Amino acid sequence: MAKYDEKKQLKCSFCGKTQEQVKRLIAGPGVYICDECIDLCSEIIADEFQETVDFDPKSVPKPNEIKEYLDSYVIGQERAKKSLAVAVYNHYKRINTNKEDIDVELSKSNILLLGPTGSGKTLLAQTLARFLNVPFAIADATTLTEAGYVGEDVENILLKLIQNADYDVEKAERGIIYIDEIDKIARKSENPSITRDVSGEGVQQALLKILEGTVASVPPQGGRKHPHQEFIQINTSNILFICGGAFDGVDKIIENRTRKSSMGFGAQIQAKHEKDVGSLLKEIMPADLLKFGLIPEFVGRLPILVTLESLDKEALIQILTKPKNALVKQYKKLFELDDVKLEFDEKSLIAIAEEAISRQTGARGLRAIIEDIMNEIMYEIPSDNRITNVIITEEAIKEKKQPRIERVEEGKIRPTLVKARTKKDIESA
């Protein structure tokens, strides 16, 4: 009997649960571990291993695999996703090939994304980096100035990438840098300026070397260089640079060029506004970028031109509901954590999309529109435990009325929606 009591009191050395409270208890020299703690340890190790797995250039995902992943997060832009998938595949294939002793050296191909505000340029670059599991950094071209002037040096872009790679320079040298608002560093006129343009042409000149591939000296703490500090040496030859911008006004340059080429006898007569901006951007040529204000050397280092289209109403509705990180899914989850069910009726989604189009903000403006409606109700829910359902209606969007709210009877509280879930439940959600 004493032996039975002793066995009954055996406990897990990690969580303290007794043998009766768990399925299995495994003994070691003076210690015990239960099946639940083993499962938990396995999950922790698996998660950490997943986070630390480095990208192997030898196992580059195929273009269709890259596009399939982009489809999960980015709605529409089929042409842009295919172009990006092929460009990224070729870039990392080049890294692997150039390591070997071959007769042909493959040149670097950076990417220029052109598209209206809110069309998904930044999201495409972020999603690519996440899929490839490579370090990623975003820089704003408007903050950059030529060396010696107030503002950020171009080397600070590389520092962000090194920091995101946990100062592993070798890992950073296979990363992706996205430079946003690149159209804002266009020079003020097509002709070279006599006066110094430190935030336009000067920045383009400063970016040339790192875009092409060079060993750059980066100050580890950022800021300006001075002769008494040590530098981090990083080779930019294998860093993929993706530059993006709205390029407002370049459509008129394209339109003027195409109109001139179609003049003369037998030319087809087109309505003045027959083509939208997205259709015109598809016809862009390097010469149009030169007229816009980019210098020839800069355009030459961005040989792959990828254009994005303006998002129409149907695309915006899909963006609200379809992707894994869709805004509607995010807000439903936030409400569920407070045991409240959130619904959007079909007309409300149409109204949100129409409002985003009228604001000319594209997908970027969707969150701001929803947040305006949600703010008041999200303030009330935590302190009103009778609210069970919230329905967002068309009137809530267009007329700024309060969403339709359903409550339980006086004296009762709402039932719990959130239940304890296993890791399997979370993964399948």
Curated annotation (Swiss-Prot):
Component of the ClpX-ClpP complex. Forms a hexameric ring that, in the presence of ATP, binds to fourteen ClpP subunits assembled into a disk-like structure with a central cavity, resembling the structure of eukaryotic proteasomes. It comes from Clostridium beijerinckii (strain ATCC 51743 / NCIMB 8052). GO terms for biological process: cell division; proteolysis involved in protein catabolic process. This is ATP-dependent Clp protease ATP-binding subunit ClpX. The gene is clpX. The lineage of its organism: Bacteria, Bacillati, Bacillota, Clostridia, Eubacteriales. Belongs to the ClpX chaperone family. One of its GO terms (molecular function) is ATP binding. ATP-dependent specificity component of the Clp protease. It directs the protease to specific substrates. Can perform chaperone functions in the absence of ClpP. It comes from the Bacteria. PROSITE patterns: CLPX_ZB. The keyword Metal-binding applies. Zn(2+) binds at C12, C15, C34, C37. GO terms for cellular component: HslUV protease complex. Keywords: ATP-binding, Chaperone, Metal-binding, Nucleotide-binding, Zinc. InterPro entries: AAA+_ATPase, ATP-dep_Clp_protease_ClpX, ATPase_AAA_core, Clp_ATPase_C, Clp_protease_ATP-bd_su_ClpX, ClpX_bact, P-loop_NTPase, Znf_CppX_C4. ATP binds at P116, T117, G118, S119, G120, K121, T122, L123. Residues 1-53 form the ClpX-type ZB domain.
